Amino acid sequence: MKIERVNDNTVKFFITYTDIERRGFARDEIWYNRERGEQLFWQMMDEANEKESISFEGPLWIQVQAFEKGLEVTVTIAKTTIDGEQVDEDELDSLLRSAMSDAEEKETELSQDVLFETTDFEHIIALSQYAEAPIFEEVKTSLYQKDGLYLLHLHFKEETEVEEQENVMSLIAEYLNFSEQTIHPVAEYGKVIVPNDVFAFIRKHFPN
């Protein structure tokens, strides 16, 4: 799970479905079993408190966005409610169900082309040091720059198993954010930084 502290009051999480399952939660039960869904949510909060020393006390405003690979959860700690809205247990349950509906529509199959993004090149350098595992042999990589973002493009072989693809994306999601952009406009209007074998190139030119 990736934890990003946006400011003093806001924290953003990204957790892949693979990570959710590794934590002992079945993908379906977190949506349809209220108690299990809340257990996962507060487990994420506890991890943020442990790693970032964030105390989640007081009213919380929560936004859940579903992607085909996982969930992005934005939590804002407020002294007062935001836009008159405050999330209680029933609303948390409703948010999770809504996110699941969106995810089911997107999750028919994993795309062969996936984009990750970051504004900090150091994150790509750090990731590259851990991207020598055999699972990365199944993916082609290229790196672009566009609108102030570094965009890492992954292209998986057609025969790549879904579990292997999710394992790769789960590791990368610890360092970079999933991008909602698609490769075609990025390739057309962005600047190519590294055309292929991104991780090997970065390790060679930016040794740890």
UniProtKB/Swiss-Prot annotation:
Q: Which Gene3D superfamilies match?
A: 3.30.70.1950
Which GO terms label this protein's molecular function in UniProt?
protein-macromolecule adaptor activity
The record's function comment reads: Enables the recognition and targeting of unfolded and aggregated proteins to the ClpC protease or to other proteins involved in proteolysis.
Subunit composition and interactions:
Homodimer.
Q: Which family does it belong to?
A: Belongs to the MecA family.
> Domain comment text?
The N-terminal domain probably binds unfolded/aggregated proteins; the C-terminal domain interacts with ClpC.
Query: What is the protein's given name?
Result: Adapter protein MecA
Species of provenance = Exiguobacterium sibiricum (strain DSM 17290 / CCUG 55495 / CIP 109462 / JCM 13490 / 255-15)
Q: Which gene encodes it?
A: mecA
